[in-house]
Amino acid sequence: MIFREQLQKQWNLNIVDLRPDATWQGFIQRFGRDLPQQDPDLCCYIRKVQPMQVAMDKLDAWITGIRRDQTANRAQSQILEYKRDGLLRIAPLLNWTNADIENYILEYGLPRHPLPLKQYPSVGCKPCTRPIRPGESDRAGRWSGKGKTECGLHTDLFNRDTLTADDFKLEIRDE
């Protein structure tokens, strides 16, 4: 969060915080502490996908930093892609590699996030992310051992025709 706040101040960014309907404590009370391990798809939907869907309902376009070399699913993506709900997804870095990213950082003197130096080149939520080991892919620390490679934001894992935000709305709200 310190890095985010530094960038926000340095570049005068308008950062919007998205949160699920319930706090972590409310989430644990409803689903239990083990949901991230027992049903990571449901956990990702409640804590990440659903809040993004609510925010994106107000948008015409979404710019994302996904790359083809990250997952098999992303390899099939297009730079400009209309999603089922009419949202235009723009992926300007889709054909970039790690070397392209590194060169861009050096050329433009961009600040570096501290987590890749701690072996976290790809970060998700705390229960489902671990540091990578030597020789592993950048995303190997995400959902390790679960056979999962995507949270659902960049897939049709959650069909909006059959699931709505109300399907998983939490009754508990901690302030």
Indicate residue ranges for each PLM-predicted region.
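Nucleotide-activated chemistry modules centered on ATP-dependent adenylation/adenylyltransferase
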Residues: 1-175
